[in-house]
Regions:
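Iron-sulfur cluster-binding cysteine motifs and their immediate structural context
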Residues: 190-191, 196-202, 220-277
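Glycine/aspartate-rich loop-and-adjacent alpha/beta segment that forms the canonical ThDP
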Residues: 159-166, 172-228, 483, 487
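Active-site diphosphate/adenylate-binding microenvironment
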Residues: 2-62, 71-72
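Phosphate/pyrophosphate-binding active-site segments
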Residues: 1-27, 145-165, 399-402, 446-448
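Thiamine diphosphate
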Residues: 45-184
């Protein structure tokens, strides 16, 4: 019955780990095609579907091309091959390609692990120089090593004529190799991100005292950082001025490829460390002060379905609850349904507890037989596989309502940045309310509870990994577990991993079940939320805040220019479309965005005068320095492959330059402005003039029948995002969209009875 109704589907598709070398290594230049390998390379089929097609069995990588090559106009392909497969049988495929003399580039990823199956060591453990020597002996004439750290490789250890290039040059290297007439090899050297994380935790690999942060006031929300990194740790954050980006410090594996995004919002923190959570409570005293919950008797088998994201500890929750039940002498079975969970896919843990072991006859929870849904991820909690286990009126649900970014978000943002097309590649949305209603309907009225587990656990304990045990604590205190709190605490202790934090997370979950508002006050005091993260309550506040911002941006006269146009728009809308305010809101946001363009003066001001440095001080502690990653317009050299200006790192001294530049903003647009003749500033002025003319035309011809079109036209500035070449791409797409919509608007003006009130595609009114 739970599956008989249509569902709001937000897929949790497996994705490469944050910082995974595959995020970069599997890409190919525009116009080229790649063949997938096995293991993690296979995932490129859905993560890079326009570039990667077909796959083969282990050891057959690239071999189908030998048969295809004589019968196609395609001159060259790339074949992805892992170091594990290379050692096993991949060398035979390369040997066959050499004999066949086909134009192909083998990209051998040396990531030092059999990544997809858990990070086992590669048999043979061939080094980069050994692989280079081996393929040279097979007759490969063109070999290039690409790596995230060229200093690791000495030219003397490699065969003669094998260059070592930085991974930022990957596109240029591949363009060179695809012109090579025979078989070439690109050895991509970068350790598996998941394995790096494990080794750092165990002290087997240095953990660099360096973290990336994004100033979301400077961020334009263009997605170029996602295009450059393909990383799941670059997450969306909603602000009064639109959807921006942030770095999830808990999941970041310190790959730093996001720094290549063409944006001045990126800052690295070198030295110091993240501040600990606000309230890592002493376990013994807290446990003693909490009232004991009712323990479910489990007279019959009690089914707990844990639904979450791979790599976040879902399987650990199953193991802990299974251990705790065993400590109490109860019967228990735990079945983990993992699949591609290690790569950020969905994972389920089926936990069944009974008074005696002989009462348990199956490990898997059957359809409609879950007593408790512990939804550690709301997307997986709403999946068909999960809903099929629920029974209205019998199942209880405790669900983490915080959204964890999906692969679709990352890929959509990246595609927008690469193309500049926001009209066709729409901003991905997360229908939280619809998903919550779906889960609530599946379990019945009053039987589902939704808690911001990730936000609370991160604020309280400094790490989002604590969220799952926070949810366990909440369910336990609500009397939804057939296991005592003491046994769960003991199981956490026996597990031996991050004992203090995990026990504290469990106890904070229990406290939240007793008094959620009190826990909210501890986790998020009013001063912890930056003002720009607070969304306006109504249109008047939206306008007033932007008037204040424009006064700080330039001066009061500049702000009056904004307010005067808004007043005329509002009066016209009230007269022509009574009861409507969509046009006024669209202009309030769109006009502000074009007036407050983030030029050199504004970037300097946003870094120094808007609380960014103070927010950093609240998040980091110790002796740290700030490094800003910028491409100054007068100094940045273009990248020979992409044409984009290359970014450089600037130390903390640049803050003084920012402060001076911010104070000089009164020069903006005057004859003394050194930036006024740049291509970007000319574009800014043209866009502003054209938008003001557009709004005047919309206001003059506004009536109920064309109101929806007017709103869509006025909202177009939201589609202009980013800096430099990224912004220019977006502006060109927005211009073409404006031309199309304006033709229809004018046609409606000439033929007022033609078509009636148009219902357009939902306009992209992200806050800006």
């Amino acid at each position: 019955a739970a599956l008989a109704r249509p569902h709001t589907v937000v897929p949790r598709v497996p994705h490469y780990c944050s910082g995974c070398p595959h995020n970069t290594s599997t890409r190919v230049p525009e116009g080229s095609r790649a063949l997938a390998g096995i293991g993690c390379h296979y995932m490129a089929l859905w993560l890079n579907p326009d570039q990667t097609r077909t796959f083969s069995q282990m050891g057959g990588e690239g071999v189908p091309w030998i048969g295809q090559a004589p019968f196609t106009e395609t001159k060259h392909v790339f074949a992805n091959l892992g170091d594990g497969t290379y050692s096993h049988s991949g060398l035979l495929a390369i040997r066959q390609a050499v004999v066949a003399k086909v134009p192909i580039t083998y990209k051998i990823l040396v990531n030092d692990a059999v990544a997809m199956t858990g990070g086992q060591p590669v048999e043979g453990a061939l080094t980069v120089p050994e692989i280079a020597l081996q393929v040279r002996a097979e007759g490969i004439g063109r070999i290039v090593v690409v790596t995230d750290d060229p200093a690791r490789h000495s030219a003397s250890a490699l065969p003669a004529g094998v260059p070592v290039r930085h991974r930022r040059d990957l596109d240029a290297v591949q363009r060179e190799l695809r012109e090579y007439p025979g078989v070439s090899v690109l050895i991509y050297d970068q350790t598996c991100a998941a394995e790096k994380r494990r080794r750092r935790k165990r002290g087997l690999m240095p953990d660099p005292a360096r973290r990336v942060v994004i100033n979301d006031r400077v961020c334009e929300g263009c997605g170029d950082c996602s295009a450059k990194s393909n990383c799941m740790s670059v997450v969306p954050v909603e602000t009064e001025f639109g959807r921006k980006r942030a770095i999830d410090q808990s999941s970041c594996n310190k790959d730093f490829s996001c720094l290549e995004g063409f944006c001045p919002s990126f800052v690295t923190i070198e030295g110091g460390g993240l501040r600990k959570g606000k309230a890592a409570a002493p376990v013994s005293t807290e446990a003693d002060s909490l009232p004991e919950p009712v323990i479910h008797p489990a007279e019959r088998p009690y089914g707990i379905l844990v639904a979450g994201v791979g790599g976040t500890g879902v399987v650990t929750i199953g193991a802990l609850l299974g251990t705790a039940a065993t400590l109490e002498g109860k019967g228990v079975s735990v079945l983990d349904m993992a699949g591609l969970a290690q790569k950020g896919g969905p994972v389920w843990s089926h936990i069944r507890v009974a008074a005696r072991q002989d009462l348990l006859h199956a490990s898997r929870i059957a359809s409609g037989e879950a007593d408790l849904l512990l939804g550690c991820d709301i997307v997986v909690a709403a999946a068909d596989e999960t809903l099929s286990k629920l029974h209205a009126g019998a199942t209880r649900a405790v669900v983490n309502s915080d959204f964890a970014v999906t692969s679709d978000f990352v890929r959509s943002f990246a595609a927008q940045a690469r193309t500049g097309d926001v009209a066709t590649i729409r901003d991905p949305q997360f229908p939280l309310s619809a998903i919550e209603e779906q889960i609530a309907e599946a379990v019945g009225p009053g039987r589902a509870e939704f808690i911001a587990g990730t936000r609370l656990a991160t604020a309280l304990l400094g790490d989002s990994i604590a969220a799952n045990l926070f949810m366990v604590g909440y369910a336990c205190q609500k009397g939804l577990l057939p296991i005592s709190p003491a046994s769960i605490l003991r199981a956490i202790e026996m597990n031996g991993a991050a004992v203090e934090m995990n026990q504290a997370a469990f106890l904070w979950g229990r406290r939240a079940a007793l008094d959620l508002p009190a826990v909210e006050r501890v986790a998020t005091p009013p001063e912890a939320l930056p003002d720009h993260r607070r969304l306006s309550a109504d249109l008047d506040e939206t306008i007033a805040r932007r008037v204040a911002e424009l006064t700080a941006y330039q001066d009061a006269r500049y702000a009056r220019r904004y307010a005067d146009l808004l007043r005329r728009v509002r009066e016209a809308e009230t007269a022509s479309a009574p009861g409507q305010a969509g046009l006024t809101e669209a202009v309030a946001r769109g006009y502000y965005k074009l007036l407050a363009t983030k030029d050199e003066y504004e970037v300097a001001r946003l870094h120094t005068e808007t609380g960014f440095l103070e927010n950093l001080a609240r998040s980091f502690e110790g002796d740290y320095r700030l490094v800003f990653h910028l491409a100054p317009p007068l100094w940045a050299r273009p990248d020979p492959a992409t044409g984009e200006p290359r970014k450089r790192a600037f130390g903390p001294w640049v803050l003084q330059a920012f402060k001076v530049l911010a104070r000089l903003r009164r020069l903006r647009g005057t004859v003394l402005d050194p930036f006024r003749f740049s291509e970007d500033r000319k574009l800014d002025r043209r866009l502003l003039r054209e938008y003001e003319r557009l709004v005047e035309e919309l206001v003059a011809a506004l009536r109920p029948g064309n109101h929806a079109l007017a709103v869509e036209l006025a909202a177009l500035p939201d589609q202009i995002r980013g800096y430099g070449p990224i912004r220019r791409r977006h502006a060109e797409h927005a211009r073409r969209r404006e031309t199309s919509l304006l033709e229809e608007f004018r046609r409606r003006e000439d033929h007022p009875d033609d078509g009636g009130a148009r219902v357009p595609e939902a306009p992209v009114l992200m806050r800006g």
